[in-house]
Amino acid sequence: SEFLKLKYGFDLPAYTFEEIQSNHIEIARSIKQLLESPLPYFQEFLSYGSYPFFNEGLEEYSYRLQQILNFIIDYDLPEAKDISVSTQNKLKKLLYVISELVPFTPNVSKLATQIETTRPILLEMLHILEEARLIRNLRSATKGISLMNKPEKILLSNANLVKSLSEKGWNSGNIRETFALDQLQNAGLTITHPSKGDFLLNEEVLLEIGGKNKALTQVAHHENHFVFSDELEIGWGKQIPLYLLGFLY
């Protein structure tokens, strides 16, 4: 909603997750009334809505993002940690690899081979990138948070980074899940990785993230479940438009 205000002057309210899950049809209708179709604005946000310098020119946006990443890895991180130039280059390579991942439980040993490092060092690198707020490491609620516990999913910090970094073309599932996790965690919600479904919110609400035809089958076994769907303007029942997560506070 902040992006819509800054770029277009639309002043729309923000909502809690509880308000969205209870009243998503009414909320989506009120947004659609003002925007006609929210989906083109949503696609814009996914490409260049996460940082305020989109107003300085969209051609420069991706270049500015790359500059910020390089500055964080080349200057900020070495000031805080003892990091070699070789490690800096591997951190950059790791970000590129993550940008092109299909969302799934990563094979950490295979990732380490790709980055030309060892498994323990790769886990430490993932921790460093998470501390720098460049990635989000999603962990299982049952395994606990430990540096040596591999994350169940690794996503970049926001969708703009995915689109800016991926050279082969991004995976739509990666974009969707990155956006969802970004918005949910920014709203202060606790998100862990469930055995089925994509996200477990506050250890009780099971969330599945997908396209507009995404079925409820993966999460239907769980009493408290919702599907957030892309390409959907107005939802129904437990099927909620994904873009509504952009109105969380």
Label each residue range with its predicted role:
Residues 184, 199-215:
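Conserved catalytic cores of phosphodiester-cleaving nucleases, focusing on short active-site segments
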Residues 4-7, 139, 166, 210:
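Short, flexible helix/strand-to-coil boundary loops that buttress conserved ligand/catalytic motifs
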Residues 193-196, 210-249:
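Catalytic cores of nucleic-acid endonucleases
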Residues 34, 43, 145-146, 217:
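Short secondary-structure boundary/capping segments
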Residues 53-195:
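Accessory nucleic acid-recognition modules appended to NTPase machines
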Residues 116, 186-189, 202-205, 219-226:
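Short glycine/proline-enriched coil/turn segments at helix->beta-strand junctions
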Residues 1-88:
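Interdomain motor-coupling "hinge/lid" segment immediately C-terminal to the ATP-binding subdomain
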